[in-house]
Design a protein with these regions (language model features):
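N-terminal targeting signals for Sec/Tat export/insertion, comprising classic cleavable signal peptides
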Residues: 27-50, 64-68
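Positively charged n-region of N-terminal signal peptides that target proteins for export
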Residues: 1-4
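Short, surface-exposed helix-loop/turn micro-motifs enriched in polar/charged residues
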Residues: 44-45, 63-66, 71, 92, ...
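Non-catalytic cell-wall polysaccharide-engagement segments
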Residues: 19-31, 38-40, 77-174
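Cell-wall polysaccharide-cleaving catalytic domain and substrate-binding groove, primarily
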Residues: 54-78, 84, 134
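Short, functionally critical alpha-helical segments immediately adjacent to catalytic or ligand/cofactor-binding
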Residues: 43-60, 104-105, 127-132
């Protein structure tokens, strides 16, 4: 009986807890939606972009990892590179949430235009892997996948299983 009551209690309180939007995300919600729709169109996958920011920095615009900084965790090299591709990002400040959101969305769009895959789910898996590890590594992984008689257009159980990256980079970028 006691186990049943604990189960009922946990069942009813777990749903609201799991369904909560991270409080930290709310201050960026309007900007994320606006920039997403400007860059990706009215059908922009805003929840996917929100999940990406949550994974990258937990909505902390001052976040620092070993190699990257800011809300969308740009490395110094990628931040320097992206302003050459997108001059409108010229006033680089990885700690500025608006800059960081726009840079992430533009980079995702740039990757989306260059990656071929067998469907939207595979496409986004490859985009997100490339976001963290670079497009060159994805292209190498796809070539290795093809050389092993697997499908280079499918991420799951195919491209995701092949890489010549070092162990730490493989873990970081998968």
């Amino acid at each position: 009986m006691r186990s049943f009551l604990v189960f009922i209690f946990l069942f009813f309180i777990s749903k609201p807890i799991l369904a909560e939007v991270p409080k930290e995300s709310l201050k960026y919600k309007r900007d994320l939606i606006r920039h997403s729709r400007i860059i990706w169109g009215l059908n922009a996958p805003v929840p996917l972009f929100a999940a990406q920011i949550h994974q990258e920095s937990s909505w902390n615009h001052l976040a620092k990892s070993k190699y990257a900084k800011g809300l969308s965790q740009f490395t110094g090299g990628t931040a320097a590179w992206i302003i050459k591709i997108f001059p409108e990002l010229e006033n680089t400040n990885v700690y500025n949430p608006n800059w960081s959101i726009r840079a992430m969305l533009l980079y995702d769009r740039w990757l989306h235009e260059r990656i071929s895959s067998s469907g939207e789910c595979n496409q986004w898996a490859m985009i997100l892997s490339s976001y963290n590890g670079g497009l060159t590594w994805l292209e190498r992984d796809k070539e290795m996948t093809k050389n092993n008689n697997k499908d280079p257009e499918t991420w799951w159980d195919n491209v995701e299983t092949f890489s010549s990256r070092s162990n730490w980079a493989y873990q970081e970028n998968r």
